[in-house]
Amino acid sequence: MSAFPSKAKVVIVGLGGIVGSSVAHHLIENGWDDIVGIDKSGIPTDIGSTAHASDFCYATSHDLLTTWTTMYSMDFYEKMGHYARIGGLEVARVGDDERMGELKRRVDSGKAFGTNVKMISAAEAKEKFPLLEEDQIQGAMWDPDAG
């Protein structure tokens, strides 16, 4: 390892996680050089949000910025060869009207922000995931771009 530099054009504090790594990648992609990254843990780190993430992306959110960022990330990972659009299913059980309402709100927001998400019936959910007990499902949110 070379000596730690005394100066740099850019210093990224917290390089070990997804955010710091993304900042570095995008700076380099846009022609920046002389970049130094530091992290209080090792690189990659296991203490930040990255290590606790689910490793699964749904494009649905209640705000445009989060939806846009997620859709950008999905396209980015796909271009890097590390994303598979396998589809994602979230279900509401019979009797859980609160959950059903939340899924419907997420679908409404997702559609408003340009995603391909939709509500599907219990029968359609079972077609996508045969292990489901159809009589236990009130409905489901289907995101074909999730992965």
Where are these regions (language model features)?
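Glycine-rich "substrate-gating" loop/helix at the edge of Rossmann-like oxidoreductase active sites
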Residues: D143-G147
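Short secondary-structure boundary/capping segments within folded domains
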Residues: I12, I47-G48, G81-Y83, L132
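Beta1/beta-strand and adjacent pyrophosphate-binding region of the FAD-binding site
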Residues: A3-V19, V36
